[in-house]
């Protein structure tokens, strides 16, 4: 009976999140969208974003159909159906979220005419839609498919293997969306900056720049649709991995270990919806403070709600209900720590960013050296925090305790994605205000909103990486337990004296570097093509710089769309193909080594790239705020170079490593019956 009510609670909360998202979308779209010029610019951004996503999803669907058939033939059709559900829901969360985002941008710009409170309301509500859809659709997919399989009378083991298929489907969408969106957005950004700011000397978001619309489109497909797919996948994967681990250790964890993570996710949705209502800013008030207030309220309410649920469901757990409650609290505390650490390394008010800005005064080279130093140093505190969380959670609840800490951390995804999706909305709002030549007081509202948006985007990347590392660790635990269950007569230990384990470790360690290199080179090629196109238009359409002729915005958008789709395919298949080859050729121990190697180097490479890139970006903004000579100074030119390097670091290669480390683990989990 308790099981039935718990499942209904999870499904009810998932539906509540989707209803909240739909009502908020209706409210946002009902807001005024400004004058004809603003609407024209917004329509161009909407058209570009839609064209890109349609082509991206068409390409993914071709790969998806092939994988659907392979999974069905070699594993089971229930797993294949799960794969399809995960892929469709992940794509849907990103698609709807992005469609709202490209409508909220112009409405935020219009609301900025009436002050910061109104503009903040529109921008945050626009972001909250994506956040609630991610957790709502994620929980609905996992709990709904689980409920259907249970109703069909399938054994628990078969149910959970089918859910691993759902995790694989969401992961596939995630890596394509993260990588393709990242190549598009940074190809546009770097190309627009190199010719616009550096060569032509025109400011950011200047309507004379032929790549300016592509740049604004990129903000949405990268930071909104890309992040939505990334955290949808991490959310779904973590819940499924925790359910699977609970089922494999039922004797220790008690009869409700499979249901517990679903209920935690459900009550956290209610906490996030209440927390979102607290995000209000008064004129002269702190924007970041208002956003953090929402996160803190959500976290505190979730912590309160976890207690009765844990006591009701986990009384029969060998570690005790209060020990598991402590594990859930560790997950929430880790969320706060990761957010604070990332802000420290990427916020303009702190030492690391100011150090990079100061280094810019002595030239381009010293800016790069300082940025690389910060990017490497920034790995220390987050990794120590993750290690402390793993130690604490294991102490209280064993491997299942680590899984619960990861689930609690991911249960805040609704609120965290809202912070992230707020970023491209305010960024676009500033761009629209600039291109539509709105009065300076509008930019005085959109600029501080955008500055905070840059920090929230960096913070959510840190959160996504930390949670991905924990999720991958839980998946690895599932892999080892599944191996043991499938081969009860053999003892599986990943011994460093075993040469196949060492080979696996080394191959796993190189994959994030190889993948990151492919992503960086792809952005370089895409940006180079944009630079050539922008130069051609400046040369062949002489009236652009004087404002008498209009640039061909659609050329850059179309070129980047084709380039991003082409470039994303090979790197995205890397984490699917490599574990299959290693597992089938070298065996399960080498595959285990591969998983650990990828988790370790993936965590460091991802943190280093995203935080370092964020520090370069905000060092440029710090100088633009009037420090070290301000805009147009030699320090500013050096900072633009650093930002140009940092852009693909933080928005393409770094974030795409998150889904990479999880896909490798999921593929390994699916391979267990074949090993």
UniProtKB/Swiss-Prot annotation:
EC numbers, comma separated: 7.1.3.1
Localization (cell): Cell inner membrane
Molecular function via GO: diphosphate hydrolysis-driven proton transmembrane transporter activity; inorganic diphosphate phosphatase activity; magnesium ion binding
Catalysed transformations (reactions): diphosphate + H2O + H(+)(in) = 2 phosphate + 2 H(+)(out)
UniProt source species: Xanthomonas campestris pv. campestris (strain ATCC 33913 / DSM 3586 / NCPPB 528 / LMG 568 / P 25)
Reported cofactor(s): Mg(2+)
Function, in words: Proton pump that utilizes the energy of pyrophosphate hydrolysis as the driving force for proton movement across the membrane. Generates a proton motive force.
Quaternary data: Homodimer.
Keywords per UniProt: Calcium, Cell inner membrane, Cell membrane, Hydrogen ion transport, Ion transport, Magnesium, Membrane, Metal-binding, Translocase, Transmembrane, Transmembrane helix, Transport
Annotated protein name in UniProt: K(+)-insensitive pyrophosphate-energized proton pump
